[in-house]
């Protein structure tokens, strides 16, 4: 049995010949879509729907009841991005070639039309720069506002703590005064007893 990494390396290193690629272009896309659909995990709604009908079983147990091991889906998903990336690169190249051909066919137009096309682009760039400047200014204002809120909230917090500390100090002073008074009374009683004897 091959390891997934060897399989992946072999799959990535395959380069079909030019003739077979042109003749079987339709077949390759069909097989790739089949690979793509077979490699996809079942949707959670499909897996959860039979379980949801059963009132004794919760919906959270849907992934546990899956017949497929979790490792295989990860390998299949790891294989998919290179295939899609290759397709995206080839379609991007084809589109670039087509747009280049269209640009060459449109080249004989007058220079006035190209100048008029350039002006809106410059205006768009200026608008973009203005919008970026506005966004930057707004973000700076928001940051200043946030900092002011933090400072004001930290100031409020400081003053609140200061006020509570003052209240605690007053309360402790009164308690200390009461205890000292009681101790003084007790000491006087003890001294009176000692003097009498």
UniProtKB/Swiss-Prot annotation:
Keywords: Plasmid. Residues 83-96 have a biased composition (Basic and acidic residues). It comes from the Bacteria. Residues 1-135 are annotated as: Disordered. Residues 116-132 have a biased composition (Basic residues). Residues 14-32 have a biased composition (Polar residues). To Rhizobium NGR234A y4nF and y4aO. This is Uncharacterized protein RA0936. It comes from Rhizobium meliloti (strain 1021).
